[in-house]
Amino acid sequence: MKKLEIGGLYKHYKGTKAKVLYEGFHSETREPLVIYMHLEDGVIWARPKEMFLGNVVVDGKEVERFQQIEQEILIKPSSN
């Protein structure tokens, strides 16, 4: 299984970006979970780790559900 980076940025196969906040466990099943935040709207989600790091089939091609991306430096241009 691929390694998960806490604090890492990931791009969902549909194009949204997310930041991994924590790794946790389901309280009843002890299934490993990934807690992450969508950068576009700030909503926090939990997904099974195996699913987060797994693949999906899109147009007959297998792709990563979340692909790790480089940190982006976002600088707001000055209004001078």
Stretch-by-stretch model annotation:
Residues 1-80:
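Mixed-charge, low-complexity intrinsically disordered regions
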